[in-house]
């Protein structure tokens, strides 16, 4: 039973790290990256469809993304969806492709983005600590029901703490990489 609690905690902590990675990927750096447009939804035959299902996104150069729309009739809709996103991008269509130049980030904007990234990292750490709390309380419940000993509880808490430390370290590494990426000119 304790092993199930630990494996559940491991799975939930992994999800927290992945969620944090996803949230940080949404923060735009000065460099072009196709994942920047992953959150954009395009109206397609009456329903919202992810951009990557109606077009392919590639890197033109360090500051330009190129979007190749599969259906030429969708070019205007894709362009409008990119413009209306909160990324502050201005797409330019050139035939069947859409070029998206990424403006350079100012020093002030970089600092604001670093604050956002740090907040996301802290949210990830909090989520991991909540998973730790849940796992430890579940183990203590088992002890109250006399399904495990006090030594088992201590051992389990130590194991869960090691998991917590490892996952928080992962988030810190992701944060450091993102901060470094943001501060590059």
UniProtKB/Swiss-Prot annotation:
Gene Ontology BP terms: cytoplasmic translational termination
Name used for this protein in its record: Ribosome-recycling factor
Keyword Cytoplasm in annotation: yes
Keywords, comma-separated and alphabetical: Cytoplasm, Protein biosynthesis
Primary site of residence: cytoplasm
Gene Ontology molecular functions: ribosomal large subunit binding
PANTHER family: MITOCHONDRIAL RIBOSOME RECYCLING FACTOR PSEUDO 1 (PTHR20982:SF3), RIBOSOME RECYCLING FACTOR (PTHR20982)
Location relative to the cell: Cytoplasm
Function statement: Responsible for the release of ribosomes from messenger RNA at the termination of protein biosynthesis. May increase the efficiency of translation by recycling ribosomes from one round of translation to another.
Keyword field contains Nucleus: no
Entry GO CC: cytosol
Family label: Belongs to the RRF family.
Organism: Shewanella pealeana (strain ATCC 700345 / ANG-SQ1)
Domain of life: Bacteria
InterPro entries, A to Z: Ribosome_recyc_fac, Ribosome_recyc_fac_dom, RRF_sf
